[in-house]
């Protein structure tokens, strides 16, 4: 009976460990997607800010330049 109970206990522990690993894996995947989204938004904001400053600088230069 001890051997059977040991096998059952081992299988239960394996199932629980696999489930925990799956949950942790899913959480890490979600966090990775979240970090990727944040980095993408930050890069988009940075590119837009640089573009706006360049456009403002060019238009300011054209305003003071006589044609």
UniProtKB/Swiss-Prot annotation:
Covalent lipid sites (N-myristoyl glycine): 2
Family: Belongs to the arteriviridae E protein family.
Summary of subunit composition and partner proteins: Homomultimer. Associates with itself into higher-order structures, including dimers, trimers and tetramers. Associates with the GP2b-GP3-GP4 complex.
Topology feature Intravirion, residues: 49-67
Entry's localization field: Virion membrane; Host endoplasmic reticulum membrane; Host Golgi apparatus membrane; Secreted
Origin superkingdom: Viruses
Primary site of residence: virion
Primary gene name: GP2a
Record function comment: Minor envelope protein. May function as a viroporin in the virion envelope that facilitates uncoating of the virus in order to release the genomic RNA into the cytoplasm for subsequent replication.
Maturation and modification: Myristoylated. Not glycosylated.
Keywords: Glycoprotein, Host endoplasmic reticulum, Host Golgi apparatus, Host membrane, Ion channel, Ion transport, Lipoprotein, Membrane, Myristate, Secreted, Transmembrane, Transmembrane helix, Transport, Viral envelope protein, Viral ion channel, Virion
GO biological process terms, semicolon-separated: monoatomic ion transmembrane transport
Transmembrane segments: 28-48
Protein's membrane topology: Single-pass type I membrane protein
Protein name in UniProt: Envelope small membrane protein
GO MF assignments: channel activity
Region described as Endoplasmic reticulum retention signal: 2-15
GO cellular component: extracellular region; host cell endoplasmic reticulum membrane; host cell Golgi membrane; membrane; viral envelope; virion membrane
Virion surface topology ranges: 2-27
């Amino acid at each position: 009976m001890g051997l059977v109970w040991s096998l059952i206990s081992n299988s239960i522990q394996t199932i629980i460990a696999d489930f925990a690993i799956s949950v942790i894996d899913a959480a890490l995947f979600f966090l990775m997607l979240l970090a990727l989204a944040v980095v993408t938004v930050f890069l988009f904001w940075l590119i837009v800010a640089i573009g706006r400053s360049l456009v403002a600088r060019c238009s300011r230069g054209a305003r003071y330049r006589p044609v």
